[in-house]
Amino acid sequence: MKIDLSRLVTESRNPASAEIDTLSTVEMLRVINQEDQKVALAVEAVLPHIAQAVDAITHAFAHGGRLIYMGAGTSGRLGILDASECPPTYGTPAELVVGLIAGGHTAILKAVENAEDNRELAQNDLKSLNLTANDVVVGIAASGRTPYVLGGLEYATLIGATTVSIACNPVCPMADAAQIAILPVVGPEVVTGSSRMKAGTAQKLVLNMLTSGAMIRSGKVFGNLMVDVEATNAKLIQRQTNIVVEATGVCAEEAEEALKACDRHCKTAILMILSGLDAEQAKTKLQQHNGFIRAALNDK
């Protein structure tokens, strides 16, 4: 079946770059940069829809659910990138935020032919994760019409999971296939059809907001400090110390002493210093308040 892509914004020609092959290198880059500046504004226009998705993901996390990204090509890789950053940044289990890409692991590094056109493949991928109604499935595709993503959203709807779509065309099948549609319209690409450019940047900004927003809402940020960060390397060990110093105002030595007393758990160390509790008391208090430092501090 022939697919008419000409009506898609993401496939149309951009008059601003029509002669880009004749420009100097600096002029060429200036055109790209000027077009990139439109991306943040396109994302700003859909903030209310992003907020709906953040609240849905936060609710899912609080009720044993997961966040599952689905995409093909660049969109799938962006989902995997965002998912992979959550454990080291927020101390989450690897299975809490998952990225699926059409074609599996091979497709992360190189294209897998016809994988994105297979709806059944998406259903099988979700079945392998034992998808439940508590989960949130986020379909990502610049065009808004990728069969793999549509198949995943359809199966997720059947199971009763919350569905979200992220696309860069204002009218597309994915908008109708999800409960929450996030559609940052960034306009035609500098290189016609190269949706890894503005569309990919918009998708990355939205994904940043989804996970960051949900983690903040889940108590994993205190002030603007990532208080669930795990000490998996030398840089993060030092970051833990800096976080405790910033959160409490104590010196680095006192912060390090508190961290050592609680197996390097930032939240516990912060609560110990600010409340005068010992490590076990602080851990218990945090558990009583689902890991929210502010709530634990306010419980006198």
UniProtKB/Swiss-Prot annotation:
**Stored PROSITE patterns:** GCKR (PS01272), SIS (PS51464)
Coiled-coil spans are none
Reactions the enzyme catalyzes: N-acetyl-D-muramate 6-phosphate + H2O = N-acetyl-D-glucosamine 6-phosphate + (R)-lactate
Q: Looking at the record's lineage, which domain of life comes first?
A: Bacteria
Which terms under GO biological process does the entry name? 1,6-anhydro-N-acetyl-beta-muramic acid catabolic process; amino sugar catabolic process; N-acetylmuramic acid catabolic process; peptidoglycan turnover
The answer to whether keyword Hydrolase applies is no
Task: Alphabetically list the UniProt keywords.
Answer: Carbohydrate metabolism, Lyase
S-S pairs: none
- Tell me which EC number(s) this protein carries: 4.2.1.126
Query: Would the keyword Lyase turn up in this protein's UniProt record?
Result: yes
Q: In which pathway does it act?
A: Amino-sugar metabolism; 1,6-anhydro-N-acetylmuramate degradation; Amino-sugar metabolism; N-acetylmuramate degradation; Cell wall biogenesis; peptidoglycan recycling
Q: GO molecular function terms here?
A: carbohydrate derivative binding; carbon-oxygen lyase activity; ether hydrolase activity
Catalytic machinery residues: E85 (proton donor), E116
The residues covered by the SIS domain are 57-220
- CDD domains linked to this entry: SIS_Etherase
The UniProt record's further free-text remark is: A lyase-type mechanism (elimination/hydration) is suggested for the cleavage of the lactyl ether bond of MurNAc 6-phosphate, with the formation of an alpha,beta-unsaturated aldehyde intermediate with (E)-stereochemistry, followed by the syn addition of water to give product.
- Which family does the entry's similarity section mention? Belongs to the GCKR-like family. MurNAc-6-P etherase subfamily.
Please name the NCBIfam families in this protein's record.
Answer: N-acetylmuramic acid 6-phosphate etherase (TIGR00274), PRK05441.1 (NF003915), PRK12570.1 (NF009222)
Report the HAMAP family cross-referenced here. Answer: MurQ (MF_00068)
Q: What does this protein do?
A: Specifically catalyzes the cleavage of the D-lactyl ether substituent of MurNAc 6-phosphate, producing GlcNAc 6-phosphate and D-lactate. Together with AnmK, is also required for the utilization of anhydro-N-acetylmuramic acid (anhMurNAc) either imported from the medium or derived from its own cell wall murein, and thus plays a role in cell wall recycling.
Q: How does it assemble?
A: Homodimer.
Instruction: Report the protein name in the record.
Output: N-acetylmuramic acid 6-phosphate etherase
| Organism expressing this protein natively | Vibrio vulnificus (strain YJ016)
